[in-house]
Amino acid sequence: MAEGSGEVVAVSATGAANGLNNGAGGTSATTCNPLSRKLHKILETRLDNDKEMLEALKALSTFFVENSLRTRRNLRGDIERKSLAINEEFVSIFKEVKEELESISEDVQAMSNCCQDMTSRLQAAKEQTQDLIVKTTKLQSESQKLEIRAQVADAFLSKFQLTSDEMSLLRGTREGPITEDFFKALGRVKQIHNDVKVLLRTNQQTAGLEIMEQMALLQETAYERLYRWAQSECRTLTQESCDVSPVLTQAMEALQDRPVLYKYTLDEFGTARRSTVVRGFIDALTRGGPGGTPRPIEMHSHDPLRYVGDMLAWLHQATASEKEHLEALLKHVTTQGVEENIQEVVGHITEGVCRPLKVRIEQVIVAEPGAVLLYKISNLLKFYHHTISGIVGNSATALLTTIEEMHLLSKKIFFNSLSLHASKLMDKVELPPPDLGPSSALNQTLMLLREVLASHDSSVVPLDARQADFVQVLSCVLDPLLQMCTVSASNLGTADMATFMVNSLYMMKTTLALFEFTDRRLEMLQFQIEAHLDTLINEQASYVLTRVGLSYIYNTVQQHKPEQGSLANMPNLDSVTLKAAMVQFDRYLSAPDNLLIPQLNFLLSATVKEQIVKQSTELVCRAYGEVYAAVMNPINEYKDPENILHRSPQQVQTLLS
């Protein structure tokens, strides 16, 4: 049947194709034939847009090995056989799947039975262990509470108890070292001791008191150990270059909480350093520095100023160094009175050198090296007293007292030396030299005074102290000098005495003018010079008036009274006498320098000489003016007075100026 159908299709297709080829004559027949329409529709189909058709044709092409009538007729059978084979293969595969699913179903059923069995058993076990679960839950709850309590206990112990390592650090051995960990443990003890006070305000007072007592005992043990160690460390600080370790500094910081132990440790430090400073001072005096540099101070004992200065300089440096050591030791101490502690210990350290220092300076002073050296030594002692007291305050009383005593001793012997020198001046007063200049004793004394004042000016003693010393030195030297000069000139004439005193006072004044704090003395000397200058001025004016013949005339004019009558009628005041005097006066006016008293040539100061000449000339002009006024006065009955005194006072003053 399949084959018959294939033939019909093939014939119909062929006929249809032939009909199409016949042209328009067969158009109407083709339109009425269904097969033709289908063929026509198939032929008009565009296969490139129908993907399903293309796929079907591709699948269909596999059935054709060759395009023959036989294969076309058997096409349907081939397709059906192919379809049957596929279905049989599908059935075979699904049979295997079915068998697997049945096996799985059996396994699932077995598992279900097992689970059911386990559920039953669990239910039975649950019913049997209900009490155990309740007990377990209760125990877990209690375990959590106990764990919390354990944590609280651990926190409490951590807060209020030390570890075994910390306990070992604090108790330690007597000779064991102190490290940074020790101070951490000690700080921990102090912190616990402070924190435990919180417990005293709760219902844990008993525990709080026990812990506080335990910490207090630990603190005392730790402080005692720290004190012993610090004492031992201080005893080792016997080298000149003292190196204070950071641990010892921390120890002093910790010991400040125990004032007694703190004080004992400072005393131990001071004792160790005192012996070191004394030994260092003796070595500096007798052995010198390392390798002989610097040389021993005793090598300069022949030079008193350097000898004393080197000793004081060494002590000044040692005092400053010891203060620095103490400041390094106590730099972390915060209690009040640290500065006082430093000064007190420095005083104790330096006290040991007082005796050897005092003995040596006394030897120098008592040997009386001379007033100038004594004064320099006195100023040196005063300077170092001021300098050292500025470093350590007034607490280093022993050393400062020793220096002050030596200062007073040197000052006393210095003024004794000046007084002795002054007394020698008065014991043997020299006569003034022929040139009326300063005596050799005066020159020597002024040279001594100049050296003393020069050393005083170059000293670094405070200003107030220097001024007070100046006043005393000047009084001790100048007053005897003035007295000596006065006694020495007492047997001279008026002009000679005035000249000698002016020269002597002038030398004193020029000496003092070079130094400070002498203003008051300079004023006193100037007043005395001016007093003697007045004498010389009067002597010079009298000398001129006498030499020109105006002295008698001037004195008579001054003493004349109206009731005595006219001057022209008085003896030696007639016109002839006056004209003769004017002749001498004219000679004086032409060469005034020829009429100078000899003493003016002995004056040391040209300025003083000019002053005397100038002021004496003014006196002469004044005297001439009075005589001129009297002669010109008609009451005195001089005839033709212009011919007697032909020069007016203004002309005379102009000529002499």
UniProtKB/Swiss-Prot annotation:
Gene Ontology BP, a term: intra-Golgi vesicle-mediated transport
Highest taxon in the source lineage: Eukaryota
Record localization: Golgi apparatus membrane
Pfam families tied to this protein: COG6_C, COG6_N
GO terms under cellular component: Golgi membrane; Golgi transport complex; trans-Golgi network membrane
Keywords: Congenital disorder of glycosylation, Disease variant, Golgi apparatus, Intellectual disability, Membrane, Protein transport, Transport
Family: Belongs to the COG6 family.
Disease: Congenital disorder of glycosylation 2L: A multisystem disorder caused by a defect in glycoprotein biosynthesis and characterized by under-glycosylated serum glycoproteins. Congenital disorders of glycosylation result in a wide variety of clinical features, such as defects in the nervous system development, psychomotor retardation, dysmorphic features, hypotonia, coagulation disorders, and immunodeficiency. The broad spectrum of features reflects the critical role of N-glycoproteins during embryonic development, differentiation, and maintenance of cell functions. Shaheen syndrome: An autosomal recessive syndrome characterized by severe intellectual disability, hypohidrosis, dental enamel hypoplasia, and hyperkeratosis of the palms and soles. Some may develop mild microcephaly.
Function (record text): Required for normal Golgi function.
Protein name: Conserved oligomeric Golgi complex subunit 6
Species this chain originates from: Homo sapiens (Human)
Gene name for this UniProt entry: COG6
